[in-house]
Amino acid sequence: MTNITKRRIEAKMEKDGIDVETVDISNFLRNQEIQNYKKISSLMMYKDDYKCNFENSFVKNKKEKIYKKSFEDFCNNFSNFMNEGFGIYMTGEAGTGKSHYTNCIYNQMKDEYIVFKTSIITLFDEIFKNFGGMTKTDFLRNRLGKAELIIIEDLGNENIKDWGKENLYFIFDFIFKAKKPIIINTNLSDVQMEEYLRILGCDKLLSRLKSKCKYYKFDWEDRRIGMYKDEIDKW
């Protein structure tokens, strides 16, 4: 299988007068990768996360309605710009819906595209587990390179040491150079994110992110406050 050219299609064969159906090898292998990345991304998904979709999203204000429509448009038009490296950057306080809409996008895209949903900590854990089988840069290049959409959950919610900083720079540099579409959500403010990404003497990562990602600021109150009030009041 490893020597099969990506776009090769098996020729039709005829046996006993019966045509054997043509098999598109590239589609078969791609579908295998879709399933593989769904399994890998499941490390970041809880049972209720799979229930998130645009249809059951409860919109609380006008700005959120606009954001929701924009996220739906991103999914519906993804094939038109997937090779350009454009993406989404969500920032705001905890509980404002960033992870919900990230999961909505993931759930809509995961069966059609090779989507890699992860966090920096989860990705670093993968490096440690696979280190020895291949170098860390080869592992990251392989893991990120096959993905058609990369989702990084809760960026900035980790304490990164020098080893991690070097890898963090490689991750984003590879994503930019390979023109990989990326979705990021974070609780950090712009000032905090700029400081977080100011690694290895490089202060350009945030500006590069903003240049390729549409910016969404979730600046409303925590929507989880009072969410279970009716149930709790029944006690």
Feature map (PLM): residue ranges:
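Short glycine-rich substrate-engagement loop in P-loop NTPases that contacts/grips substrate
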Residues: 65-71, 106-146, 159, 165-166
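Walker A/P-loop nucleotide-binding motif
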Residues: 82-102
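A short, basic N-terminal segment
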Residues: 1-73, 211-216, 220, 224-235
